[in-house]
């Protein structure tokens, strides 16, 4: 049969509690399979001349049974009857294939590890979250790819999935009794999972989750919620798992000017997008109107994502927004993000602290007041032994550098500007307080950009390019 017409492997779940499983082999290959089998409460007999250390410890604890000896045809033939599954897990392919042939002759499912051809079943890469089981298989064609896929899936699975699954399991009979109609029951579960009830269950707040579920069963509409989420400095790979989860579950998203398209692509595709355009003093939507819009949408039952660059509580006006939500009685969550100072500095190769020259780091905003002046703690800023990270400081960069020199820092004090930090088109300019404004102007540096001031700039590390062919 050609690869194009081969139907492949049929996935199914098998209950192994108390079932006898024979494993031939006592080394590292066998260990990986025995670990999985023990997690599913199988009764394991191992045929091998000797056991590696972990297997030997499990044998001493009575968790497995060891039949000492080589995998001769007679020994294998005597051991296999009555077993539910067989694993041929030695480091000798010929031995594994001989074991597989004997198991096949007895109609016992057998897996010759890393050798699909003689196997009647294979063991996929697995993810466990309580009652939830996810299996990923490439049909034995590419086990490393299956493991990589498992890692990616695990990365986006919410941490509370186990608690959610157990809650649903516990409430299933209650929902069936309260809602006999299958179609309506399915809609109740969908609304529960997509709303605050599912979120509460994931957090282990079962009383709150049960209250939401009972409201849905009674025909009530669930209330909305606002999520203030920090999206990090720009690279989508720097999103937290929690941020990504909420981005993919929001009904609507209010987002700012500086979020790159690659990051916005991670938002649920059918979510309504509302651009509020906050950038310095140019606002598509004033802050009071943003607050009102968040409240309006939440009261309409929406799960509203307020997506902000960096961290919502570091120069992001997140504090003002949650005060408005609290006053209106709107439930909310805050998800921190990697702030620009740490993200951009790391990608630029500039440490924020250094034992030799910077024992502290000061975050300030370069956003001028309405009259154009900078209201900053200049005496605290113009000190050696620290790093200054200046947010939104490009426009006021000449004044910032002038004032730092006026308050005591030397003109040749190191400084840098990181434009579009963490993104593919990131630029880093290094200089001094005396020449950085001219450098930034000559290179037409724009927002978003972060200014770093301090001796740490001289410790910048530039990552070398990868070697050819790697």
UniProtKB/Swiss-Prot annotation:
The active site is at 256 (proton acceptor), 278 (proton donor). It comes from Gluconacetobacter diazotrophicus (strain ATCC 49037 / DSM 5601 / CCUG 37298 / CIP 103539 / LMG 7603 / PAl5). The gene is cysG. The keyword S-adenosyl-L-methionine applies. Then it catalyzes the NAD-dependent ring dehydrogenation of precorrin-2 to yield sirohydrochlorin. Finally, it catalyzes the ferrochelation of sirohydrochlorin to yield siroheme. Keywords: Cobalamin biosynthesis, Lyase, Methyltransferase, Multifunctional enzyme, NAD, Oxidoreductase, Porphyrin biosynthesis, S-adenosyl-L-methionine, Transferase. One of its GO terms (biological process) is cobalamin biosynthetic process. This is Siroheme synthase. S-adenosyl-L-methionine binds at residues 233, 309-311, 314, 339-340, 392, 421. Residues 1-213 are annotated as: Precorrin-2 dehydrogenase /sirohydrochlorin ferrochelatase. Pathway: Cofactor biosynthesis; adenosylcobalamin biosynthesis; precorrin-2 from uroporphyrinogen III: step 1/1; Cofactor biosynthesis; adenosylcobalamin biosynthesis; sirohydrochlorin from precorrin-2: step 1/1; Porphyrin-containing compound metabolism; siroheme biosynthesis; precorrin-2 from uroporphyrinogen III: step 1/1; Porphyrin-containing compound metabolism; siroheme biosynthesis; siroheme from sirohydrochlorin: step 1/1. NAD(+) binds at residues 28-29, 49-50. Disulfide bonds: none annotated. Pfam families: CysG_dimeriser, NAD_binding_7, Sirohm_synth_M, TP_methylase. It catalyses: uroporphyrinogen III + 2 S-adenosyl-L-methionine = precorrin-2 + 2 S-adenosyl-L-homocysteine + H(+); precorrin-2 + NAD(+) = sirohydrochlorin + NADH + 2 H(+); siroheme + 2 H(+) = sirohydrochlorin + Fe(2+). In the N-terminal section; belongs to the precorrin-2 dehydrogenase / sirohydrochlorin ferrochelatase family.
């Amino acid at each position: 049969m050609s690869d194009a017409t081969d139907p492949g492997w049929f996935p199914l779940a098998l209950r192994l509690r108390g079932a006898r499983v024979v494993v031939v082999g006592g080394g590292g290959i066998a260990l990986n399979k025995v670990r999985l089998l023990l997690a599913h409460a199988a009764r394991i007999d191992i045929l091998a001349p000797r056991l590696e250390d972990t297997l030997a410890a499990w044998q001493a604890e009575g968790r497995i049974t060891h039949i000492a000896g080589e995998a001769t045809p007679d020994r294998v033939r005597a051991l296999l009857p009555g077993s539910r599954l067989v694993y041929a897990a030695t480091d000798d392919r010929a031995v594994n294939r001989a074991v597989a042939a004997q198991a096949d002759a007895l109609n016992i499912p057998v897996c010759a590890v890393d050798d699909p051809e003689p196997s009647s079943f294979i063991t996929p890469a697995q993810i466990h979250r309580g009652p939830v089981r996810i299996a990923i298989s490439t049909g034995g064609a590419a086990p490393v790819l299956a493991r990589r896929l498992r890692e990616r899936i695990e990365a986006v699975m919410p941490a509370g999935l186990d608690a959610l699954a157990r809650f649903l399991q516990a409430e299933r009979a209650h929902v069936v009794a309260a809602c006999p109609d299958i179609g309506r029951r399915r809609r109740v579960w969908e609304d529960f999972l997509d709303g605050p009830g599912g979120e509460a269950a994931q957090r282990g707040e079962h009383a709150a989750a049960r209250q939401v579920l009972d409201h849905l069963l009674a025909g009530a509409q669930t209330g909305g919620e606002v999520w203030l989420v920090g999206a990090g400095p720009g690279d989508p790979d720097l999103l937290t798992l929690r941020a990504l989860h909420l981005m993919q579950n929001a009904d609507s998203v209010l987002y700012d000017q500086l979020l790159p398209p690659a990051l916005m692509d991670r938002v649920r595709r059918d979510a309504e997008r509302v651009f509020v355009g906050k950038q310095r003093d140019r606002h598509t939507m004033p802050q009071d109107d943003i607050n009102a819009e968040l409240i309006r949408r939440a009261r309409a039952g929406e799960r509203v994502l307020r997506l902000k660059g960096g961290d919502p509580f570091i120069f992001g006006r997140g504090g003002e927004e949650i005060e408005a939500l609290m006053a209106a009685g709107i439930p909310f969550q805050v998800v921190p993000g990697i702030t620009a100072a740490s993200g951009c500095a790391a990608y630029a190769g500039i440490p924020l602290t250094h034992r030799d020259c910077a024992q502290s780091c000061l975050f300030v905003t370069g956003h001028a007041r309405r009259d154009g002046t900078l209201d900053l703690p200049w005496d605290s800023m113009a000190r050696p032994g620290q790093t200054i990270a200046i947010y939104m400081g490009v426009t006021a960069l000449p004044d910032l550098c002038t004032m730092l020199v006026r308050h005591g820092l030397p003109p040749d004090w190191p400084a840098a500007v990181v434009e579009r930090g963490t993104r593919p088109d990131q630029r880093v300019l290094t200089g001094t307080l005396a020449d950085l404004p001219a450098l930034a102007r000559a290179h037409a540096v724009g927002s978003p950009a972060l200014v770093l001031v301090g001796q740490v700039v001289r410790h910048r590390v530039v990552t070398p390019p990868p070697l050819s062919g790697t």
